[in-house]
Amino acid sequence: MNVKVEDISSIKKKLSFEISVEAVDTEFSNEYKKLSKTAKIPGFRKGKVPRSVLERQYAGHVEGQVFERLVNETFFKALVDEKINAVSAPEVVDNGPLKPGQAFTYEAEVEVRPDVEAKDYIGLDLKKENFAVEDQDVEDRLQDMLKSRAKVEVSEREVAQAGDIAVIDFEGFVDGEAFAGGKAEGHELELGSNSFIPGFEDQVVGMECGQDKDIEVAFPEDYGNEELAGKPAVFKVRLNQIKERVLPALDEEFAKEAGLESVEDLKIKIRESIEGQERDRIEKDFRERMTDALIEANEFEVPEGMIDSQIDYMLKNLQNRMQAQGMRLEDMGINAESFRQIYREVAAKQVKASLILEAIALQENLKVEEDEIKDKLEEIVETSGAPKEAVMNYYSNDESRRGLVSQMAEEKVVAFLTGKAKIEMVDKEALENAKMTEE
């Protein structure tokens, strides 16, 4: 077998093969011998059918089998011999005739992993949000908790106000005609929730129980029903009843229901929770800004095969999470194909970032040591609450372990780059303004 390798681009190679007559004849001979054992030809016993008879009836089938075997065997051997890091299946772009007694030639193209040499990654100019939890943040979260445990009771008030739950009958009309789906009785509408057509809830505020009222609104231009989008409408509304949410008392009993001893302990817990959530959000945003800067400084092509693999990985993760919640992808209004289209650019960015971080790890000799892996596994056991044996068994799987090590390696590179970066701490508003300027 003779192989010639040519670079088509930085991410694609062409391999030209010439396979000897002997190798071709051996494959044809093996295929016909195998076929002779199973072929049913009138007048011949299995295993006794002459090759000439088989050739007349099965030549096309045998040629296809030999073609597939020769390409697979020679192509993947060439990848090893030539040390080619392929990231996609081969695409045969040309081939000569495949006949017994003749050498066989073919050409195949394959995408390869780009050879990335990272640059301009020391001293990145980055902005990072400076955040501190304010007392008002804690109070707001505390109010949310109280509201989530509120009881809905019939109000003694006769006039509806913002925040009330109005129990209404309504029927909508466009151009004087009732429309499908525009009528309901005993509908509970929280005033101020903005869950109805814009302007509707504001006009219910101030109505008295038992009052009838014509409410004039206009459907939004982007309304889901095209027949109603942008059109003015009149709703005939009757306010039947007013309900309100009664918050529980903020006392020791409430704190104990949340698993804490006092209101002060609850506030401390809430503060810690907010700090943790904000810290995660800020770190995620900071890492995105870092990878954006790295991608901008390091331009290179990314193989379509690597992007496809990343999209498949993202899709599988999403499907698994949704399945665990008893949901399907279609429940989000998308399917696998539309997901691939929507998130292709995101996947390409993730692949680029990963390749750059891997290159930096190699260039800076940043490695994940065995004792670091052990410490990480202990941390996973502690934070997840899962049995140690279960965690160790899961990460004894080669694929799971590689994923963990890859994640740890990226974290090590990010920590290295953070230590070398020029970081300006700014408030949230300044950071958002900077984002708008960059866009």
UniProtKB/Swiss-Prot annotation:
GO biological process, one term: protein transport
Keywords linked to the UniProt accession: Cell cycle, Cell division, Chaperone, Cytoplasm, Isomerase, Rotamase
EC number: 5.2.1.8
Every PPIase FKBP-type domain range: 163-248
Location (main, coarse): cytoplasm
Pfam family, one: FKBP_C
Signal sequence bounds: none
Reaction catalysis annotation: [protein]-peptidylproline (omega=180) = [protein]-peptidylproline (omega=0)
GO CC terms in record: cytoplasm
Top-level enzyme category: isomerase
InterPro entries: PPIase_dom_sf (IPR046357), PPIase_FKBP_dom (IPR001179), Trig_fac (IPR005215), Trigger_fac_C (IPR008880), Trigger_fac_C_sf (IPR037041), Trigger_fac_ribosome-bd_bac (IPR008881), Trigger_fac_ribosome-bd_sf (IPR036611), Trigger_fact/SurA_dom_sf (IPR027304)
GO MF terms held by the record: peptidyl-prolyl cis-trans isomerase activity; protein folding chaperone; ribosome binding
Subcellular location: Cytoplasm
Comment field on protein domains: Consists of 3 domains; the N-terminus binds the ribosome, the middle domain has PPIase activity, while the C-terminus has intrinsic chaperone activity on its own.
HAMAP family: Trigger_factor_Tig
Family: Belongs to the FKBP-type PPIase family. Tig subfamily.
Function: Involved in protein export. Acts as a chaperone by maintaining the newly synthesized protein in an open conformation. Functions as a peptidyl-prolyl cis-trans isomerase.
Name of the protein in question: Trigger factor
